[in-house]
Each structure stands twice: as C-alpha cells, then as structure tokens.
C-alpha cells in the first residue's frame, strides 16, 4: 500500500505577491530613422507559484516556492537605413533566482534547500536580429514589391527544474522569408530553423523518468493571400 495522498496539500496553495519596478525610455532619433526602447526591471516575488514534479513521479502540482527575485535589462533598436532596407536588433537579460525555497525532505529525511538556484523556465538571455530589403516597382507593373527577409532568434540558458539539474544551453535559429506582392495577391515563401538546429523546448518528469520535447526541424512553406 502506498502512502495516503493528502488531497488538500496537493490542491491548495497560497496566492502569489510581487513588487515590480521598471524604468525605461523610448527614443526616436535621426528624424525617426532610428527607434530605440530601453528598460531595466526588478521583481521581488513572495509565495511564488511554480509547477513542481511530485515525489511519486506521476505528474506535477502547483506549490508555493517561498520567495524569488528577478532583475534584468531589455533593449531594442529599429533602423530604417533607407526606403528599401530595415534592420532590427533586440536583446534581453534576466537573472531570476530563489531567495528562499524550502523543498521539504527527501525519502531519507534529508532537508532540500533550493535557495540560490535559478527559477525554472526563465531564459537568461533572449535575442533577435533581422533585416528586410524591399524592391518597389512601378504601380503599372503587375508586381508591386518583392521583399527578402532574414532573422536570427536565440534564447538560453534555461533550467527546467528547481533542482537546476536539467537545462537547455543557449541556442539560436535562422529564419528566412521572400514576399511577392501584386495588386491582389501576396505570396510568401518561408523557411524556419534553416540550419536544422536541435534543441529542447520543454521538459517534464513522470514515473521517475525525464522526457524532453524536441524542437521542430527545418520547415519550408508557402502562404498565399488574395485581396478582394
């Protein structure tokens, strides 16, 4: 016979409270050709709610993790080089750790303390960089415009558990798009994860086993839109 399940302990948890502080600015420079957004933030969270793997290994439950703090910066830049070329870059840094987290005891009655560990599912770095170049044609031409676009998106490091024993290191994906615009038709040919990068998008544990949800491989597609 297994240990009797305490339903109240697994279904009842306290509300989460947080104090959030943020300063930032939005700038438009060089007659609007360069736009920037800058921000810095700090979050002080108490009774933080997280999804925790249960000791039996059969699923997860919501628990209060004590307190945590998060701080970081975000920056984005959008530049219109000329009427044909646009470029954008964005970056974010987040440092999110538990200030206090009593994880209970192990089967051998050893105390579990996750204080100082990183909060799971929070990427430390996020970034995006992209560029679009457009060719514009005479309005009498059947082709109105042709746009070539490329972008690179990255994230990591990401911890998947409060133990910080499973993680995904920093990864990036390359994406591209070609858009053809006519008076009534728009055709987009696109590719995602062009380098076929392999990474983990989610992790969970059940029956004392860990399972990873893997990334989607290289994808190619075509979108067609008709304007009435």
Language-model regions, residue ranges each:
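Outer-membrane beta-barrel translocator domains and adjoining extracellular loop/strand segments
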Residues: 1-8, 48-56, 94, 99-107, ...
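Exposed loop/turn and edge beta-strand positions of beta-sandwich/beta-sheet ligand-binding modules
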Residues: 7, 17-19, 32, 59, ...
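Residue-level signal for pocket-adjacent positions within structured domains
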Residues: 8, 40, 58-63, 113-114, ...
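Membrane-embedded beta-barrel scaffold of Gram-negative outer-membrane proteins
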Residues: 12-71, 92, 96-102
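Conserved C-terminal beta-signal and adjacent last beta-strands/turns
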Residues: 21-22, 115-228
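Short strand-coil-strand connectors
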Residues: 30-32, 82, 181-183
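Hydrophobic packing within well-folded, soluble alpha/beta domains
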Residues: 38, 75-77, 89, 178, ...
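Gram-negative outer-membrane beta-barrel transporters
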Residues: 42-44, 63-161, 225-227
């Amino acid at each position: 016979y297994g240990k009797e399940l305490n339903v109240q302990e697994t279904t009842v948890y306290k509300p989460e409270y947080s104090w959030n502080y943020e300063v930032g600015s939005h700038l438009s420079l060089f007659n609007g050709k360069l736009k920037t957004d800058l921000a810095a933030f700090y979050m002080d969270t108490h009774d933080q709610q997280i999804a925790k793997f249960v000791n039996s290994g059969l699923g997860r439950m919501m628990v209060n993790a004590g307190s945590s703090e998060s701080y970081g910066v975000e920056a984005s830049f959008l530049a219109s080089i000329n009427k044909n070329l646009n470029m954008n870059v964005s970056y974010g840094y987040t440092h999110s750790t538990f200030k206090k987290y009593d994880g209970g005891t192990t089967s051998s009655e050893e105390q579990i303390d996750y204080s100082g560990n990183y909060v799971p599912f929070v990427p430390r770095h996020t970034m995006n960089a992209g560029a679009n170049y457009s060719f514009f044609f005479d309005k009498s031409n059947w082709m109105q415009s042709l746009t070539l676009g490329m972008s690179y998106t990255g994230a990591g490091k990401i911890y998947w558990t409060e133990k910080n024993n499973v993680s995904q290191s920093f990864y990036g994906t390359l994406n591209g798009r070609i858009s053809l615009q006519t008076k009534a038709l728009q055709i987009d040919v696109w590719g995602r994860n062009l380098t076929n990068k392999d990474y983990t998008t989610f992790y969970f544990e059940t029956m004392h086993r860990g399972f990873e949800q893997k990334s989607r491989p290289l994808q190619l597609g075509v979108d067609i839109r008709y304007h009435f």
